[in-house]
């Protein structure tokens, strides 16, 4: 950053999003973050900053390794495909990022290895053993006390016991320093509720050292001096914010790093704020680097009454919504519906409502009416007639005040509120039309200059509003200004009213910006789309490559009479718990007809007790009772086992009552 106070160069501003995890196609909730960051980056450019906007993909980890294996491809092939999908959607949404980093980039991987070695050499990283509860989707270890109802506190999924050799980072060494920093910099974690959560739930109770390597999978960045270990996700993923700028822990930093670090804003989802406000600043302290100026944990965009997830079947994708509404409309929906701190809700019904009331009516109809009246009454010419009224001053005051309010809201990252201020300009313009009644003025030749003044004021106000709208709806902003034959107004000039050149002409063929939509027709299309997707699933399954087969050592043949001695029935699991003295066993209460049998099974590594309850299973009913780990078992649950030792319970294909005979 330039240190010369007399220099006219722009002040740097570095904004980042969390890098997207390449486990699958991003939904609109994921897409919200990149659109939010883009609107902030664009507005900062309008404010005169030299903006660096970075996003990208997080491409290592056990979850990806497993997904790639299931897809029959290498992990690199898998992440190449998903990263391509993510980048395509980011580009579709017209995001103006400067850098798209991938954690599989060679320069990033090289720096992560050097950072790991440097921290190890300094004594911040040491080798030990980790034994705890592991959540594979989150790639995080937890203690028993950190679980919520026995499940992962971040995603709510099941956790599994795990023990392995690992390297650890001495978090506790820097805890007091971080607490002091947060107290001295109240702006560091925003909103304030996120700060209170981090302090009260994690920092003040005491930090545990952090596992920073894994040996149970291979898809990661190897530790150079101990290659059976791969770097654990957060030391890999978080460092993208500096490696993407050309950071070199040997001191040979690139120009971008020297110019833009520390980051002005890390924009992330509230679910990963712990990693960005505890782990990341401590890593930076250990490296001797300044901390980012602010971490903002934005709320979630919900569909209906819950967070979007494929497992819930409530996922909306950006490209699907764009097909229905267009890019700028989708940008408007997600930005407008997201409050500063609380979760926002999006639905098809709400989007159609916003399309009709806000975009088609308040904005689109205003622009069309103004241009049409200018063509009808003055052949498209827009001139200031110089005949003013008190209502004109009120219009001007509202417009100029809304500009200041919108900028103030953006400085606070209250993007939805800023958009509301911009639309207040358009609302005031519509009211101004009702107040001045241009159609009535047009009937009186003596009011011609007054009519010209009214239309000039409308074009000027819309020009300011459209210019301010560019950060949020860039294509719409350009379309409006093009139809008005207006130059985009710089933010620094928006403290003035009346800069539109008198005598300019608007287009003689105004374009409809947003067409009204019929909710019934939209929902019919949505249902047809869902039906087509559902119908395509079996076809997709059939199109998959032939699954591998397993050959096992055959056992001796038996007579039918021997087989007939076994009694197989359908059972319903009504209760289940782990066997305390065993790491492998679950004890299930199985309802078989009118009786209930207790059955112990070695499936703890494959099913949680909660998953078992309610399942219909196939049971060998008449096995002689036996004790396993001291617990009585009165039967056997039938399972299949693949070549890797994964077990799957045998369940009826169709709905069958408890007690039905298997024959």
What are these model-predicted stretches?
Residues 541-663:
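Phosphate-backbone binding interfaces of nucleic-acid-interacting proteins
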Residues 2-55, 107-111, 161-376, 418-422:
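Structured secondary-structure scaffolds
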Residues 127, 350-387, 398-506, 620:
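Helix-rich, typically C-terminal accessory recognition domains appended to large enzymatic cores
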Residues 477-562:
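Intrinsic disorder at enzyme termini
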Residues 82-98:
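A glycine-rich helix N-cap at a beta->alpha junction
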Residues 93-102, 120-133, 145-146, 160-163, ...:
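Short secondary-structure capping/junction motifs at helix and strand boundaries
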Residues 2-82, 101-116, 121, 138, ...:
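N-terminal catalytic cores of NTP/NDP-binding nucleotidyl/phosphoryl-transfer enzymes
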Residues 122-175, 179:
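Cys/His-rich short segments
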